[in-house]
Amino acid sequence: MGVGVAVAQGQLRPDISTLEAWQSAVLRASAIFYTHASSGRYIHGLLTSMGLWDKVRSKVQRFDNGEAMLLSLSQAGTPPGAMAMGAISEILTFAHRGVEWVGPLPSAIAHQTIYALALDLQSPRLGPAQACVHVCQQADVWGDVSRTGVEPL
């Protein structure tokens, strides 16, 4: 699951096509939203390691989760030029709900969080768990799932 950028509906979509363009967009943003979740920890690490943190610290707003972040971004009081960075799957669920998808982080800093399924062979619910794994292995399911920002490995 990748990390991407969003803006409030109707706002200018910043150029984030390269590392330099993303850095410039971050510096120009009026507000920067990200979460305390894994994607937000990654963004915070980027800002720190790239020497941007001291320049943007006053503009950063962190949220407990992607839903809270994106709801805030979509509100009427959000300053023009605000940008949110988070899990692509969360951003895409808010498309057409006051949030516009800008795109994934540029390839130089792209980040994927990998999730895996595992079965507990001692589980009293092993049958339903095996059925879930079976569904997840079906190629025809991934067309729908990919539209949510989740990609199979």
What are the residue ranges of the model-derived segments?
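Exported/periplasmic ABC-transporter solute-binding proteins
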Residues: 1, 6-153
